[in-house]
């Protein structure tokens, strides 16, 4: 089947010469099409840290399947290793002034930016809604659990859990 697809008039990608896959060129093209970096031993995307590389392997397979015939899993593993080198960034520090949410980014000063323009360390699967009503059940639970003066302390602690810092304002 692969022999039928190796015709001279076919528009082959730069990384495929008709018989071999150039992993470095494949990774360059892949990084032009997809926002992803590699830092601190992990891949990061606009959705946050990639904890399972199976979807990434699937994307690579989808691009390779028309030209790779032998040892496809090993070829994908090799490409992932080259991708780590190609996408490597020297420093990817945490952003301490923002919380990335499913529909955008909430800055600690209260401003909200919609969309996912940047590669981030983490993104919570919760949508920001500035018009949300008070969480009555949660507040009743806290009222039954703590003294009224202790509730702000717990809320502040939970807030610190959402940002990569333990410094106060």
Identify what each model region corresponds to.
Residues 1-10, 42-71:
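Short, small/acidic-rich helices and loops at N termini and domain boundaries
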Residues 2-5, 10, 28, 33-34, ...:
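Generic cytosolic/nucleocytoplasmic N-terminal low-complexity/intrinsically disordered segments
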Residues 8-17, 70-73, 128, 132, ...:
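Extracellular glycan-interacting surfaces
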Residues 11, 15-21, 25, 69-106:
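Extended, Lys/Arg-enriched charged tracts that mediate electrostatic binding to polyanionic substrates
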Residues 16-34, 147-153:
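Phosphate-interacting basic helix/loop segments used at nucleotide- and nucleic-acid interfaces
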Residues 29-30, 59, 63-67, 79-82, ...:
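Residues that form generic nucleotide/phosphate-binding pockets
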Residues 34-55, 99-100, 105-169:
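P-loop NTPase catalytic core of nucleic-acid-dependent motor ATPases
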């Amino acid at each position: 089947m692969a022999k039928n697809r190796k015709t001279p008039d076919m528009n082959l990608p730069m990384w495929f010469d008709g018989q071999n896959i150039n992993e470095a060129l494949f990774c360059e093209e892949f990084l032009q099409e997809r926002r992803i970096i590699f830092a601190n031993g992990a891949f990061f995307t606009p959705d946050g840290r990639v904890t399972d590389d199976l979807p990434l392997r699937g994307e690579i397979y989808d691009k390779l399947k028309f030209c790779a015939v032998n040892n496809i899993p090993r070829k994908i593993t090799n490409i992932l290793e080259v991708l780590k080198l190609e996408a490597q960034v020297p420093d990817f520090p945490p952003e301490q002034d923002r919380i990335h949410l499913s529909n955008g980014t909430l800055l600690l000063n209260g401003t909200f930016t919609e969309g996912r323009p940047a590669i981030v360390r983490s993104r919570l699967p919760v949508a920001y809604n500035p018009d949300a009503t008070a969480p009555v059940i949660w507040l009743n639970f806290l009222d039954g659990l703590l003294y009224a003066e202790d509730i702000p302390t717990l809320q502040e602690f939970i807030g610190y859990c959402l940002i990569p810092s333990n410094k106060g304002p």
